UniProtKB/Swiss-Prot annotation:
Residues 23-61 are annotated as: Disordered. Gene3D superfamilies: 3.10.450.80. Belongs to the eukaryotic ribosomal protein eL42 family. One of its GO terms (biological process) is translation. The gene is rpl-36A. This is Large ribosomal subunit protein eL42. It comes from Caenorhabditis elegans. Pfam families: Ribosomal_L44 (PF00935). Keywords: Ribonucleoprotein, Ribosomal protein. GO terms for molecular function: structural constituent of ribosome. GO terms for cellular component: cytosolic large ribosomal subunit.
């Protein structure tokens, strides 16, 4: 289990160019646009008769995703992303583990 604090003091690539406090959140994929070129092409190909026209991917190999931290500078609001290792359980701003404590999911 990976537990990451909600705030981190790290270097700001933006206007600051120095170590500042950053607000940490987890990156989430945005909603896909209906008007991207690939989506338009796919929709056009799918319309009409003829069933499924492109292969549906079924051979999933990975059981986890890499966690991406999105850090926002508290001074200049510049945002940067930091990928960390793969993990099954990710927690943002959870309790710190004390000695001899059992992990609860």
């Amino acid at each position: 289990m990976v537990n990451v604090p909600k705030a981190r003091r790290t270097f700001c690539d933006g206007k600051c160019r120095k170590h500042t406090n950053h607000k940490v959140t987890q990156y989430k994929k945005g909603k896909e646009s209906k008007f991207a070129q690939g989506r338009r092409r796919y929709d056009r190909k799918q319309s009409g008769f003829g069933g499924q026209t492109k292969p549906i991917f079924r051979k999933k190999a990975k059981t986890t995703k890499k966690i991406v931290l999105r850090m926002e500078c508290t001074e200049c609001k510049h945002k940067k992303q930091l990928p960390i290792k793969r993990c099954k359980h990710f927690e943002l701003g959870g309790q710190k583990k004390s000695r001899g404590q059992v992990i609860q999911f």
